[in-house]
Structures are given as C-alpha cells and as structure tokens.
C-alpha cells in the first residue's frame, strides 16, 4: 500500500443538475465534469463526486499508487484503476491509482 492523499468524497444525489447548482451557489466550487449520472466538483484541496443512487456506494477515495498491480482492480470509464474496500463498520473506501491522469 502506498497511500499519498485523499482524492475525493462521493455522495449520492437524486438530481445531479440540482445538486451541482446548490454546491456551486453555496461553496463556489468548480465543476470539473458533469453529465446526467455524475458530477465532479473541485474545491481547493479536495473533490466531491455526486453520483446517482446505486451507481457507486458513498465513499471516500485515497490515492494508492499500487492499485494498478492488484488482481481485483477495476477500471473507471476515465481509465483510472480502483478497488473498493470496507472497514469493520462497512464504510466504503475507494483506492485509486491516478497514474498520469
């Protein structure tokens, strides 16, 4: 394991467009990506991913440069490798390898 930093926090949203407007108005964040199923909001030191229910579990993500070497890794549509793990209380942690992305 080679953790470097927290990358993002993912929370569910039943209406991505409505949530993006709310976060922009209340936190003045930047929209890095948005479509009908998810959005990525940029803050100074972290990102928030808004996802539709059932798409991904609510979680926080940490960068782990060794994820690409794991046999159980999956690949997001943007090419980033990831694995989900759960702590003893079933909280979900995503480990991602941003590589050169």
Language model region names:
Residues 46-50, 90-93:
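Short, charged/polar, Gly/Pro-enriched secondary-structure boundary elements
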Residues 3-6, 57:
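Hydrophobic residues on conserved beta-strands that form the core of alpha/beta folds
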Residues 1-4, 100-101:
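Short, Lys/Arg-enriched, disordered terminal segments
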Residues 1, 10-48:
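Core segments of cupin and vicinal oxygen chelate
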Residues 4, 36, 78-80:
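Loop/turn position at the start of each blade in beta-propeller repeats
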Residues 7-10, 61:
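Residues embedded in well-ordered beta-strands within globular domains across many folds
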Residues 15-16, 55-101:
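Vicinal oxygen chelate
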């Amino acid at each position: 394991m080679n953790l470097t930093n927290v990358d993002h926090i993912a929370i569910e949203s039943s209406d991505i467009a409505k949530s993006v407007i709310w976060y922009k108005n209340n936190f003045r964040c930047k929209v890095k990506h948005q479509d009908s199923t998810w959005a990525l909001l940029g803050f100074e030191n972290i990102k928030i991913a808004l996802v539709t229910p059932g798409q991904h579990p609510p979680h926080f993500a940490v960068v782990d440069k060794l994820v690409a070497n794991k046999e159980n890794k999956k690949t997001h549509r943007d090419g980033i490798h990831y694995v989900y793990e759960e702590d003893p209380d079933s909280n979900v942690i995503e480990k991602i390898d941003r590589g050169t992305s």
